[in-house]
């Protein structure tokens, strides 16, 4: 995960357009309503609101002020207080002083490569960034279910390439991961080495069996079972191609031929260089 974060910092710092023109969609879960915010900012992040009967839970709040303004305006229209903010992978800004994180994530986001990445973002994006979340942090052990705003949230260990991030099963229906399993090529921010292919594949198979019917990502928004099945097959094919020890040029050609016209093809050559070292 450290290599991925460093790569993200370098790539995103090169693009400082942060004006948000995001969009929202809603999905009815078992006992709650899920509101999805697509920021359309430089990070292409997605943020989430889980609306219970009397209160809200915010997950992965936006990082930029323009996005946060849109997000907060939408929240106010819902007319319910924010009970808790959940930070799984992305530290942002939110009004709640009660913060929940998966086990180990609080320390991880406050030191080493993650702290350096956020410092780099601050230097690049300056005042366009929100003040990062501060409050009383509660960490949730993996395998534990907690109840927030009257809704169950189960925290399971996420894929090893995203550790210490968690897979969070929301209301027995929606599984939040770092990357939604959408029908597109992976890039070097998701998969940075041959080893991480197997880790990501193992994580998706765990997500398939977690009880969810939709899968969410901090990047990519909402994916259905067809998207999940595609991504499992896609990573399985990458694993098979790598087993033959191809050079980067051969691997890139083979992957493009296996998935012609698939979104994200412009990043396949860079992916091949990373995986075929």
Placement of each model-derived feature along the sequence:
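Divalent-metal (often Zn2+) His-rich catalytic cores of metallo-beta-lactamase-fold enzymes
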Residues: 197-254
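Active-site HxH/HxHxD metal-binding segment of metal-dependent hydrolases
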Residues: 73-145, 242-243
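C-terminal regulatory/interaction regions
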Residues: 21, 247-277
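Conserved beta-strand hairpin/beta-sheet module of binuclear metal-dependent hydrolase folds
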Residues: 23-77, 166-179
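Sec-dependent N-terminal signal peptides
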Residues: 4-13
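Ligand/cofactor pocket segment of small-molecule handling proteins
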Residues: 138-200
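Boundary at the C-terminal end of the N-terminal hydrophobic targeting segment
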Residues: 10, 18-22
């Amino acid at each position: 995960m450290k290599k991925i974060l460093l790569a993200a910092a370098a790539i995103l710092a090169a693009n400082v357009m942060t004006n948000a023109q995001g969009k929202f969609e809603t999905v009815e879960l078992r006992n709650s309503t899920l509101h999805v915010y697509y920021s359309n900012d430089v990070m292409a992040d997605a943020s989430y609101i889980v609306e219970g009967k009397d209160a809200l839970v915010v997950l992965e709040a936006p990082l930029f002020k323009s996005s946060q303004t849109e997000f907060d305006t939408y929240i106010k229209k819902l007319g319910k207080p924010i009970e808790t903010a959940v930070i799984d992978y992305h530290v942002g800004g939110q009004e709640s002083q009660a913060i929940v994180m998966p086990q180990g994530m609080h320390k991880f986001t406050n030191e080493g490569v993650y702290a350096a990445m956020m410092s780099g973002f601050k230097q690049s994006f300056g005042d366009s960034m929100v003040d990062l979340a501060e409050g009383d942090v509660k960490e949730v052990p993996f395998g534990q279910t907690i109840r927030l705003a009257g809704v169950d949230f189960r925290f399971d260990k996420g894929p090893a390439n995203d550790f210490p991030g968690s897979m969070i099963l929301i209301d027995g229906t929606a599984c939040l991961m770092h990357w939604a399993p959408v029908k597109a090529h992976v890039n070097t921010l998701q998969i940075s080495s041959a080893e991480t292919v197997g880790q990501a594949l193992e994580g998706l198979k765990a997500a398939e069996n977690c009880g969810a019917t939709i899968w969410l990502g901090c990047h990519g928004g909402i994916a259905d079972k067809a998207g999940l099945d595609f991504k499992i097959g896609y990573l399985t094919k990458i694993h098979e191609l790598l087993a033959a020890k191809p050079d980067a040029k051969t691997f890139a050609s083979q992957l493009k031929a296996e998935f012609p016209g698939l979104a994200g093809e412009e990043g396949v050559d860079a992916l091949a260089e990373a995986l075929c070292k």
